Amino acid sequence: MDMITVGQSVKIKRTDGRVHMAVVAVINQSGKCITVEWYERGETKGKEVELDAILTLNPELMQDTVEQHAAPEPKKQATAPMNLSRNPTQSAIGGNLTSRMTMAGNMLNKIQESQSIPNPIVSSNSVNTNSNSNTTAGGGGGTTTSTTTGLQRPRYSQAATGQQQTRIASAVPNNTLPNPSAAASAGPAAQGVATAATTQGAGGASTRRSHALKEVERLKENREKRRARQAEMKEEKVALMNQDPGNPNWETAQMIREYQSTLEFVPLLDGQAVDDHQITVCVRKRPISRKEVNRKEIDVISVPRKDMLIVHEPRSKVDLTKFLENHKFRFDYAFNDTCDNAMVYKYTAKPLVKTIFEGGMATCFAYGQTGSGKTHTMGGEFNGKVQDCKNGIYAMAAKDVFVTLNMPRYRAMNLVVSASFFEIYSGKVFDLLSDKQKLRVLEDGKQQVQVVGLTEKVVDGVEEVLKLIQHGNAARTSGQTSANSNSSRSHAVFQIVLRPQGSTKIHGKFSFIDLAGNERGVDTSSADRQTRMEGAEINKSLLALKECIRALGKQSAHLPFRVSKLTQVLRDSFIGEKSKTCMIAMISPGLSSCEHTLNTLRYADRVKELVVKDIVEVCPGGDTEPIEITDDEEEEELNMVHPHSHQLHPNSHAPASQSNNQRAPASHHSGAVIHNNNNNNNKNGNAGNMDLAMLSSLSEHEMSDELIVQHQAIDDLQQTEEMVVEYHRTVNATLETFLAESKALYNLTNYVDYDQDSYCKRGESMFSQLLDIAIQCRDMMAEYRAKLAKEEMLSCSFNSPNGKR
C-alpha cells in the first residue's frame, strides 16, 4: 500500500469496460482495497476497487516504488588498475545492481504476500559477489575493497513462471564479478521485475474480482437460464396447443389428461350383479353435445370405477396460476357416457318392478340440471323435438310390469294395471291426460292424499302405455333455454298403479318423476314474479324431497310432506318398510356446467350419505332404539292432519224443484261452505308453515334467513290464491242459482195480482246475500293484491342466495 497515497490519481475500470482517472479517497489496509472518487455528469461518484485491479491498470506504480526504495550508495573513488581504466564505472554499476536487485526482491515478496501466495522455498544456491579488485580513480593510489554481499534468490514452485525466474537469474551474475554484459543488463533487470509484478497483478485480478462484477455476471447467468427455460416452456405450450387447436381451455384439458393418466379405469359392465337397496342413488354422465363441441367445451368428468366419479374443477391461485381441484364422489352406481338407457334401467328401476307386485310403493326420479338428460332418460330419446318413447324408463318399466303380471305367481292375483300422468308447476297440479285440467290435492278421512279429478286409465299392454306417454309429453309445460330447446319447466309424474279386479284399493304403485331443472331454483330473485314463484317451488320441492328420503331411511315418524305439492302427492311412497326409492342424478360433462354439476352431485351425495349413517341407532344392548314422540308432538301431528279430513266439497247447486223460499237458505249455505273452506285452508296453511319451519331447521346450511322469509311469503301468496280462486268458483255457482231465482222472482210481476210485499221481501233477502258474497269476494281479492305487492317489495329488498339445494 506504500506506493499509493490518498489524493493520488489512478486509473480505474468501470463495469461497462470504460477506463478513466479517479482520485484515491480511502485506503483499506485490512481489506486490500481502495475507495476512489470521480466527477461525472455534474455529480461525484465513487466505488471500491481491489488493489490488484489498481496495479493491473497502473503498472508505473510498481516502477516508482522500486526506484524510491533503491537508495544509491556513495561513490568511492579509488585507483584502478591499468587493465580496468577503460571502464571506470564498472564497480559503481555493480553496486547499484546489487542494491536494486535486493529492493526488487523485497518488493516482489510484498506483492506475493498481498496475493496470499504460500511462503517461497528458498534454494540452496546463494548469489555471492566478491569484489576484490581495486578501482583507480583519476590516477590516485587509494584502493577500495568491496564488501561481500549475499543475495538469496527465492524460488516459487507455482506462483512464479519460468520466464520470471529466468529474468531474475539473468539480472544477477553467479559468483562472478560484474562485467560489461552484466552492466548492460542492469537496467533491464529492474524492468523485468516490474513486468513480473504486473503479470502477478493481472493474475490476481482474474481470480479476485470485485463484488459488483460478480453480481453482474450472476444476473447475466440467471437471465440466460431464465430465457432458456422460457423458450422450453413456449415450445411445450405450442406442442400442447397443437393437440387442441383453437381451444381456449387447452391448458385445463392437458391437466385433466395428466391426472387421468394416473387413474385405473374399471367401468360398470352389463353382466355385473345388481345390488338391492331400499334407497339407491346413482349418477349418469351424458355425452358432450354438438353445441358444446362447437363452443370448444372440454370434458371435466371422469368415471374411473362403477361406483366412483371425479369432477375436475379448474381453479386459479392468487397469482393467476391455474390448477385442478378434483372432487371425488361415490354412489351405488356411476354410469359413464357410453351407457345407454337400457343399462341404466337395468340397475335402477328394474329391481323396483318386483316391489309393487309384493304390495310396496316404488319411486324412481331423475334429478339434475336442465339439458343434462333427465327427460331423455325417463321418457326416451329425442329426434329433434320428437321424442321416441320406446326406449325410455317409462316404457321399459311398463313392459316389465306386463311380463311380471303374466307370471304364474302373480296371475292368480287378478291385478288390473292403470296409468296416470300429471305435472306440478308452480305449486299447481295439472292433468296431462285431460287437457291440462287443474287438479286439487286433498287428504281423505284415512289421511290418504288424493288427487281430486285425476284421470286414471286402465291399460292392457305396452302400446297403450306408450300412447299415454306420448300424449302427456306433448302437453307438458316446456320452454326454450340456452341449454335445451325443449326444456322441462315442471315436475312430471307418471304412475303405474296395480289394483285387485273390482276394488279401488291400491295393491302397489310405481311413480316415475322427471324433475324440473335444479338450476331453475336460482331464479328466486328474478324480476318476473312467475319465475320467482317457479324457482321457489322447485327449491322447496327438492329440499322436501331430500328430507322425505332421509325420513324413509331413518324410518322417521314424521314427514315434512306438506311443504310442496310434489311430496304431498308422493307421501305414500315414503311410508312403510316395503317402500323403495331410486334416484338418478343426471350431470352434464361440459366445463361451463361445472358448478351445477357439483350442486347435483352434492345433493345426491347427502341423500346417500345420510341414509348410510342414520338408518338405525343401535343401543348398547344391541336393540334398535326407536325415535320417541311425546304426547304434545302426537297432538300436534293430529292437529296438523285432521283439519284436512273434515274438509267439505262446496256445492251450491240446489234442486230445481225447490221453492223460492227454500232456495235462499241454499245460497246462504253456500257462503257457509265458503267460510268453512277458508278456515280449512287457513289450518292447512298453518300446517304447511310448520312443515316449512321444520324443513328450514333441518336444512339450516342450505336455506338462508332471507330465502326462508321469501319462501314463506310465496307460500302465503299461493295459499291466498287458492282461497280466492276457490271462493270465486263458488261465487260463480252461487250466481247461477241466484240468476235462476232472480228470473223466477221477476216472472211473478207478470201477474196482475202478485203480492208486492212478498216480492220486495224476497228480493231484499236475495240481494242482501248477494251483496255479502260480493263484498267478501272483493275483500279477499284486495287482500290478495296487497300480498302480491308485499311479495314484490320483499323480493326487491334483498338478493336471494345462489339457490343452494
Curated annotation (Swiss-Prot):
Which CDD domains does the record cross-reference, listed alphabetically?
KISc_KIF2_like
- A biological process term (GO) from this entry: non-motile cilium assembly
Main localization, broad class = cytoplasm
Which keywords does UniProt give here? ATP-binding, Cell cycle, Cell division, Centromere, Chromosome, Chromosome partition, Coiled coil, Cytoplasm, Cytoskeleton, Microtubule, Mitosis, Motor protein, Nucleotide-binding, Phosphoprotein
Domain Kinesin motor as annotated: residue spans: 278-610
- Give positions of region: Globular: 1-274
Q: What tissues contain this protein?
A: Expressed in male germline stem cells and spermatogonia (at protein level).
**Biased composition range(s): Polar residues:** 80-94, 158-179, 648-664
| Its biological purpose | Required during anaphase to drive sister chromatid separation to promote flux by actively depolymerizing kinetochore microtubules at their pole-associated minus ends, thereby moving chromatids through a 'poleward flux'. Involved in asymmetric cell division of sensory organ precursor (SOP) cells by playing a role in the asymmetric localization of Sara-expressing endosomes to the pIIa daughter cell but not to the pIIb cell. Klp98A targets Sara-expressing endosomes to the central spindle which is symmetrically arranged in early cell division.
Outline the subunit composition: Interacts with Alms1a (via C-terminus).
What is the protein's given name?
Answer: Kinesin-like protein Klp10A
Its organism's taxonomic lineage begins at: Eukaryota, Metazoa, Ecdysozoa, Arthropoda, Hexapoda
